Every structure is written in structure tokens, then in C-alpha cells.
Amino acid sequence: MKNNNLTYEKSGVNIKAADNFVKFISSLSKKRQNNKNFQNIGGFGSITNIPKNIKNPQIVASTDGVGTKIEIANELNKFDTIGIDLVAMCVNDLIVQGAKPIIFLDYISINKINLRKLNKIIKGINRGCKISNCELVGGETAEMPGTYSKGKFDIAGFSVGLVDKKKVLDKSKIKVNDLIIGIPSSGVHSNGFSLIRYILKKKKIKLKKNKFLKKELMKPTKIYVKEILKLVDKKLINGCVNITGGGFEGNIVRILPAKLSAQIYLYKVKPKNIFKWLHSQGVSDKEMIRTFNCGIGFCVIIKQQNFKKIKKYFTKDFQPYVIGKIVNGKQNINLNGKIEW
């Protein structure tokens, strides 16, 4: 006799829970959408208009995740800001080319649909989109029993931005004697967490009982969209760098023209307390610099005469300051002095 009791739900996939999550996302999205073309979450694809004020639009796309910061979120059972991190990691890359973020999509894979957890994550994503002035237009939630262990998940984001061809920030605009301006980070952002978790494990630090680390490690990545796009609009910058994994050396080199180098004055960098703590745990200067942002989350390359002009576009906590300059060379990053931990 045949047994016809096999169902998708018995295999570990709850379609009804997934549908309820889509409805929740749609309700969030509709609250802040002004353009009817955006109201299509749950469809097969998302449609949007190209803003009329961008005369010769160039498309810029970026995708990223938040790495093992999700493990810290899981340990602390705190999921309301990890979505902001996800948006930040994508849109901060878009603005390096001078692009305005237009749309954002997310991908969440999880062992079992947990609406409480997922609702908090998506609220954070929605908040990140609001800060970035872009729209959450869709995504994918994959319930994957057997792939992830109990309670585990991963998230990824994808964002598209537009920039007028005449305003694209490319290497050709960067010249000798341009200043390298550091813009403070909000903290660790979303890079280096595998090393942080290794330190916590090796030092047997109980994260839940450490108020300082709980607060610092879950601070959301700073989104620089508003400030940088104002500078692009005012034609005050020649280049941008998002300081992520690889630190100063691994990221600044990516925007240098072939015959130019960067001089970085490490002694001018102002490390936040979390970086001082990490250094005190036995992480060498070299490892700190190539793994973490060390207090500088974003850099802009500007003409010397524009420094005073850009300061007014930043709040008190994110006031920019000079950390280096562009010199002749062969795409080298020259690190001068030491960071004062």
C-alpha cells in the first residue's frame, strides 16, 4: 500500500511561514514607497523608473554580505541592526563611483524560518535603505534544512545605483598633491569578525557579560551615502575609497592611477576604543592595519583647497581629517609612522 503522506513541510520547508514573511516585507516597503513602480515585492521581478534628473545615466551594481558578524548577532540574539550593515556594505561601494543607490535586494538563507528573527533583520534592511534613500524592491528567503545547523543563517545584499556619466568618479581625476581625507567609522563595521571571534574564544571572553564589547561589536556600519553624494554634486572630490577588508593598503590601491602612489600618515589616524582593545589583546600593528578600518571607514581624495569646504557636510561625530596625500610612484601605499593606540 502506497504512503502518500510525504510533504514539503515534513522535509523542513514551511511555505506558509515564508509567505507570511513576504507579506511582512511588503507591508514595510509600502509604508515608505512613493513610486507605485516600486510596489511589487512578491512578484517575479521589480520594475523602476530611471530618474529624469540623471541625463546620461550609468548603471553601477554591487553585492556583498556581512561575513561572520552574523555569528556575533546570533550569540547576542540581536538582529535589529545586522540589516543596516548589509545595506551599508553594498551602497558604500556604489558611492565610490559617485552613484546614487536606487534599489536594493536581499538574500537570506536559514535552516528554519524564524519570523521573529527574520522580521528584525528585514526591519534593519529597510532602515538601511531609508538612510541610503533607496528602495527595497525584492529578494529571496531560502529555508535550507540540512545545509545550515540549528539557528544558523547567512545574508547577502545586491544594490543598483545610477550616476551621470559626467559625474563618474574614476582614477583619471586623481592628481599629485591631492589630499587623502579620512572619514571616521562608527566602529568595526563588518570586517575582521573571524579574527575577533578567535580572540574571544582564545581569551575565553564571555561576550554576553561584557557591556563594552556587546555595544561596540554590534554597532551598525556607517552609511556614507548622504554626505558623499553631496560632495559629488558639488564637484568637491576626485576619488573615494570604502575602507573594508584589507584596510588602507588593500583598498586605497584600488583607486590609484598607474603612475601615482599614496602616502598615509598613520600617526594621524585616531583609533576608536574598540581598536585599542583589539590591539591590546595581542593583534600586531601590521595585522590591525590590514584587517580593520582602525577608525577610518571611508576616504575621499580632494584638491587641497577643498578641505575646508567639505567639512560642513559632516556631523560632529564624523568630521573628516587629513590622513595622507597623493604622490608620484607606481601604485604603492606608503605607510608612515605608527598609529597611537
At which residue positions do the language-model features occur?
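Short beta-strand-to-turn element immediately C-terminal to the catalytic PLP-Schiff-base lysine
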Residues: 49-50, 160, 201, 300-302
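Short helix/loop capping segments that flank catalytic or ligand/cofactor-binding pockets
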Residues: 69-70, 190-192, 233, 252
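Residue-level detector of flexible, active-site-proximal loop/helix-junction positions
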Residues: 22, 54, 67, 143, ...
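Acidic/polar, glycine-rich intrinsically disordered N-terminal extensions of enzymes
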Residues: 8-32
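Acidic, glycine-rich loop-and-beta core segments that form the ion-binding/anion-interacting portion
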Residues: 176-215
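Glycine-rich phosphate/pyrophosphate-binding loop regions near the starts of catalytic domains
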Residues: 27-186
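Glycine-/charge-enriched secondary-structure boundary and capping motifs
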Residues: 2-12, 27, 117-132, 148-153, ...
